[in-house]
Amino acid sequence: MVSPPTIRTRRARWVVLVAASSLCIGSVVAAPASAEPVYPDITDGLVHHFELNETSGTVVANTGTAGAGADGILVNPDRAARGADGIRFNPDDYADALSGAYVRLPDDLTAGMQAVTVDYDIWIDPANVGEHQIWSLGNKTSCDVAGGQQGQLFSSNTQRLRVAAGTVNVQQNRVRLPEGVWKHVTYTQSPNANGTTWTGTLFVDGVQQAQSATITTAPSVNAAGTNCNFLGRSQVPGNYSFRGTLSDFRVYDRSLSGAEVVARAAQGNDEGAEADAAAIDLGLTSAVVEDIELPKLGTVAGSAITWESSDPSVVEVVTPPSATSARKVPILGVITRPALGADDATAILTATLRKGSESVAVREMTITVPAEFDEAHSVDRDALDLELHSTDNVRGNIELPNQGRWGSTIVWESSSEYVSSSGEVTRPAYGHPEVEATLTATLAKGGAEVQKNFDVVIKPLPREEENERYFLGYFKGEGMADGEQIMFATSNGNNALDWTGLTGGWPSLVSQLGDQGLRDPHIVRSPDGDTFYMIATDLNWYDQGGYAINDTQYIEVFESNDLVNWTPQRHVKVAPDDAGNAFAPESLWVEEIGAYAVFWAQSLWNDPVNRTGQGNAQMWYNTTRDFQTFSEPKVWQNPAPQSRIDTTAIKVGDEYYRVTKNEAGNAGSDIFSEKNADFLDSDINAWELVAPALGRTTWQSTAGYEGPVIFEANAGDTACPGQFYLWGDRYTNGGGYQAACEANIEAQTWQAKTITMTNAGVPRPRHGTVLPITLREWNSIRGIPNEDVATTVDIAVDDVRADQDAEVTATVAAEDGFEVGGEVRFTAGDWSETVYLEDGTASVTIPARLPEGEQSVKAEFLGFDILLESEAEASFQVLPAVAASVAVTDRCVAGRVLLVVTATNDDERKVSLLIETPFGAKPVGALASGKTHAAVFTTRAASIPSGTLTVAVAAGDGSDRVQSVYTVDYGAMSCS
């Protein structure tokens, strides 16, 4: 959330701000004055005065002559922030006119007035969007329903700053109040000589912006008075509620003179210019080594800034031409550095700031320009500039530069096998812990060398799940006030033809940078699956007056790990300086280079200084691993003198297929497909033409198509199973996106399908992206709780000999059939070990020497993430270390019992025996595998009681010698 800087007309605050900033990088020079300026208030005719500075409650005090009986009421106060600088309406989210915060003003606010002045301070939130009204006075049969309007007087900043008096708009076409800065606005309406019409004049910072002398709606709006009077709310319930701050709102029952309007704005202009001067930040001015981009406007109050240099041989100010076509070209401070070994040079940059017609502030900043770097300085500066992004959340390959801006060679080393010295990342498996590593950069130039370490945290892989739903990012179109912002929708079931908008057609993301428009959003999922990068065109056709005025080399970048929470917008320059635009950017993961290719349409100016003579449209590209650092742009498709734009791409097997628009003009434009095994091949003749006219052969032969989307249907898709989808934006004859399916990616004509959109704001979305997603992702996006997943454990263990380790494997399965990860704890007796699952299984070795006989082992899956705990237990036999069979029989000789012990070697090894009985012991030196030895023991008795004997069976020698003792019970024996 962007908060307005403190700027209200309280001079002490300004002085503190100016003084504090002056200590940093320069000084603010005010015009000489003998004393503090005096700003007399204008109170003559001030009927309603709402300072809007209450810090609590819902009453908005009226300190004008109308008094407390005409106080206002803050409605929906939980959606407002109150403070000494005004009421901040809807700082956190969007709302319609009824549910958002607004002030209800008293009825009949301007009753009986033949002239009126409305005067206030305003800070418009950069997130403000859509049809809205800043203030409005109306007469309606019911304020909270559409229709029934009997007259209205209101102001808005939609498309342009305007005041509407009945059917007349007082406006200067396409001039809007700048957002994120404080402005003073005044509207006066005075009767003309004929007594039946009025002249309305609109001022910003005391300077006239627009005027109309043909107004037929009186300041009183309606003879019956007004019953729907608001601050921050529209007369139309379905409009947006205003987002921004209003302060010091005044209504006079007369038209202030031009001099009075200037006087009303004077204090804010003076203090605003000083605050803008104090807020200028040129960075490290004590060591400037590259050209500086100098601001044109103040960041607090929007003052216009011009620049001069005391020494152009050190810092030359290069101001772009005043032509409208070049208005986006920045002012540059071009640096000339002293030669190696020379003294540092200095120059004073002077910024002159003007706000309104009379307020001027001056800021002087000393710029120190070091001499050309020697080797040591070059290395130190490259080390200072070297940075890596998101090092605590690594989820893909890392961009590791090998060359510094100042000529250093950079060599990298890694402390971990999980990240290579060239930045390729191998992530731990799902369910495994994150890995910490250190990347060490050694920067060297000549004999100078320095090292810089970066600690990184490599996150484990996400859970693999099957895609069962779809996600759509799109924009609505340039014909509506909120149409060029990003909207989201999700499929209804596993069907890429049936959709519901997430926010009822309201934007999910609003641009606050560049042109403050977001068109053509494209979303790419990382190859590991848990990072989403969204890029969009920096263009606001509706507010800026059409695409032809676009002159930006930037794209807008957002990043997410869940398609719900997005990083703040990044305004990223990708196109070269002489490009007139960077339209419809898309990206694709290119496995062969381990990075993303980012590609866009652009034209190059024939005259890059004045920004005139736009050439043919081409496709250019660069590469990136993180959408933070991009390679230098390169030509990808240049069909000169023809034009191409809007490429989308998909890889099928070993081939890359791209679908592109040929810019033949209106209905002659169509989309066509090509293929190549080398995605970055810039020889357009090396690409094989597959289908030359996909749009007009698939949908309507007389229409033009652009903005293609191509993607593979999910398994189980109910509309086009086992096929590919192709969407094309029919920008002529209306219609928006048209859809088609085909099993053959190389089909010349596809099967047309119908897209159904609900709560999307338009019947058909415009140029965007369809992204296959999992059911759990779909639930999270829609705000549906995801249930945890039950698991089961299956144990596999075989019987073992007492001298052998027992191998145990646990297989864990999830109830939903998708990937499992985490730890399994094995327990057998007093032994325990915990191991991680690998591909759904965990194996351990129970050490040998377990007691012979039946044993049990338990495997406990400890649960992980969404996976619930489970366990299982299994039994196994621990067999003797040496395998043998022992039998006991008896026979009688001469009336005496003979005990016969038979031992068989069941082992694979040769064994020795020691047979011990109550009647003696007999050793057997060697018994081959499979052989049997019988030993006879004479008892010398006619009968013997039951008893026990043992046979010790040994195998191996030395430390490898093992022995098993077989104990055999025998019954009583008798020869009688």
Tell me what each language-model feature is.
Residues 15, 787-881:
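Solvent-exposed beta-strand/loop surfaces, strongest in extracytoplasmic domains of secreted
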Residues 66-98, 118-129, 149-217, 236:
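Extracellular glycan-interaction surfaces
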Residues 43-47, 56-60, 94-161, 193-199, ...:
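Extracellular glycan-recognition modules
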Residues 40-43, 104-118, 174-183, 220-225, ...:
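Extracellular/lumenal carbohydrate-interaction signature centered on repeated Trp-anchored short motifs
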Residues 17, 32-96, 213, 262-271:
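Extracytoplasmic low-complexity segments
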Residues 93-94, 166-167, 212, 223-247, ...:
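Extracellular glycan-interaction patches encoded by glycine-rich segments
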Residues 432-433, 457-788:
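Carbohydrate-active catalytic/glycan-binding domains of CAZyme proteins
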Residues 352-355, 443-445, 828, 851-873, ...:
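Enriched for extracellular/lumenal, surface-exposed ectodomains of secreted and cell-surface proteins
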